[in-house]
Amino acid sequence: MSDKNPRYSRILLKLSGEALAGTKDMGIDTEVLDKMSLSIAHLRGLGVQVGIVVGGGNLYRGAQLQKEGLVGRVTGDQMGMLATVMNGLAMRDALERRNIKTRLMSALPIGEVTESYSSRNAIRYLKNGEVCIFVAGTGNPFFTTDTAACLRGIEIEAGLILKATKVDGVYDKDPSLHSDAVKYDGLTFDEVLEQKLGVMDLTAIALCREHDVPLQVFDMNKPNALLNVVMGENEGTRVYH
């Protein structure tokens, strides 16, 4: 594999908050941060340009508060956006400890903490060899960070959007609950939408389909899985037009 060139020169990686929590129920697992920053360092060493969208579910889950009427949907979503900023700060520092220059770009203006998101600036940074972490989702309530990942991937002209999960791809049903669950090696966007497989929310899938940007779902805990995907190896589940 070391003799091959990467299949993709620019990617968008989606890291959910739950993935960052690792084996914990909440919070950030430092081992996950360390492993992921190392994987990204390997990609940068191969010249791959990397954009990252992080979720916030490991720090804030608003469903219960909203259910109990303590906060409204808009407020809850805004709290979730702020949680992604905290995750982004942690990921930025993990990357910079490996001497990888990293930009933290927010869809919400947060003066002294991040810079405001601009697709033109992001592409410029990526071309200069910097990693860009995109936080605060789309900046709007009612949109998931999965949708934000697809949107940012399209805006920065990524060749592939990768979703890092705790399972090794997409199954016809939850493999943690059903021993007979069947894994898909490949699916079309239409099949995902028709079967409602839950790869990402429907808005995110529709965006990728409309702009013909492939999606790869892989197990972030499997050694070298991220590198394998970018090198074009068979890993996880591919969703395509």
From Swiss-Prot:
Record comment: activity regulation: Inhibited by UTP.
Taxonomic superkingdom: Bacteria
One GO BP: 'de novo' CTP biosynthetic process
A Pfam cross-reference name: AA_kinase
GO cellular component: cytosol
Protein purpose: Catalyzes the reversible phosphorylation of UMP to UDP.
Gene name of the encoded protein: pyrH
Cited CDD domains: AAK_UMPK-PyrH-Ec
GO molecular function: ATP binding; UMP kinase activity
Organism whose genome encodes this protein: Psychrobacter cryohalolentis (strain ATCC BAA-1226 / DSM 17306 / VKM B-2378 / K5)
Family note: Belongs to the UMP kinase family.
Cleavable signal peptide: none
Keyword Cell cycle: no
InterPro entries assigned: AceGlu_kinase-like_sf, Asp/Glu/Uridylate_kinase, Uridylate_kinase, Uridylate_kinase_bac
Catalyses which reaction(s): UMP + ATP = UDP + ADP
Protein residues bound to UMP: G56, D77, T138, G139, N140, P141, F142, F143, T144, T145
Amino acids binding ATP: K14, L15, S16, G17, G57, R61, T165, Y171, D174
Keywords: ATP-binding, Cytoplasm, Kinase, Nucleotide-binding, Pyrimidine biosynthesis, Transferase
Functional pathway: Pyrimidine metabolism; CTP biosynthesis via de novo pathway; UDP from UMP (UMPK route): step 1/1
Keyword presence, Transmembrane: no
Enzyme Commission number: 2.7.4.22
Location in the cell: Cytoplasm
UniProt name for this protein: Uridylate kinase
